[in-house]
Amino acid sequence: AAFHYFRCPEELWRDRFRQIKEAGFNTVETYVPWNWHERIMPSGLNDNSHFDFSDVKRWLKMAQEEFGLYTIVRPGPFICAEYSGGGYPRWLAKFCPGGMDDFWLRSADHRHISWSQHWFDAVCKALADEQITRKPVGEKGIILIQIENEYNHHGCYGKEKLLKALYQSVRKSGMDIPIFTCLTNECRSSEDVELSQVFDSDNYYVGLSSAPDCAYRMANLRKEQPDAPGFVTELQGGWFSLVTGRLSEDHYSDARHFKAVGLMSLLGGAGGINYYMFFGGTHFAGWGARGMTTSYDYNAAIRENGARSDKYFEAKAIGQFIQAFEPQLVRSEGGPCAMEGGAKSLFGGVRVAVDGTRFVFLHNTDPKNAIRGKVRLLPGKMNRPATPMYNINQHGEKVLIAASEAADTDSVTVSPINVSYDLPA
């Protein structure tokens, strides 16, 4: 569950954690913005005197010790997050070299890398003691740390150079937990001695009728990284509001869409899903990115004022399903499959556990009309997507993710399964 400490008054943290715990989550995730923690410009690379990590440390301790939640941290240095500067401090512009043709931030320029290491050395050392590897057996702690963010969406040269520098900073600063990134092809099945130790994950922001893409894309991710967990870093939990633009509650991402993307991710073989946002919060004191409203309500499961939306109860139901069948689900095989009969808008698939338990997933892609009838599922016969798959970026634009033939989920062969269905719009 995504919940940012810097978007919520500390007096309300405990309530938000309680609600997340009651919804069945075992982990919370947060970005860690550089500009939030080093607001005053240092005198140079070796000056760490202006860092203040006291609030994030309190947030981590509350999550882990009071509520028994694992934690995931994502310190960027670029975080996007509809946040001021994408997490970069404004004072960093003073050190931007003149005469550069390309965008300096996120680049492989050695001066940018040096400042990124300045940040990573500090934040990793500050959080190292909160790692689960430093905790007594049975206690919770940080289980994952992310480097960079959605690097596929940024066109620049030498990405491997920056990623390797960040990896080295994490390890040299005492962090020994697994390192991951998201939507960063340079780390998928890499043969580099360091980047091969970083697993990639996916972000799913899909159209109203495109929830099945989550199943295909997760199956593809598992195929590309067979030894890594299938993790959705950001599973669409809503959308942000824009000044003079559409508000969060006007977005199509309703409770039905929320449920569909969750179940379809599980069909594809997800081993972890992080709803972004599960609680959105507020942009205090102008910390939102340009064009963002003060509210970061996100039409999330837990609203800005702490109320529970319909999405909350869908999340709770999915959590109960996962808790009931976790051992079977996490070791199951399968995915989307061909079907005989059934409505045109019906999509489905099967996952089979080691003990023979079969999980059938069905979804109605028609947002207007309910469907009912009978269908025969044919596990082992792949039902491939008819069109290319897209993600929706922060500008509302479609970004091509994978060609239609990319996913391969023909991993099980069991007898056909006959199912009667009655699915709402």
Can you annotate each of these PLM segments?
Residues 1-3:
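Mature N-terminal segment immediately following signal peptide/propeptide cleavage
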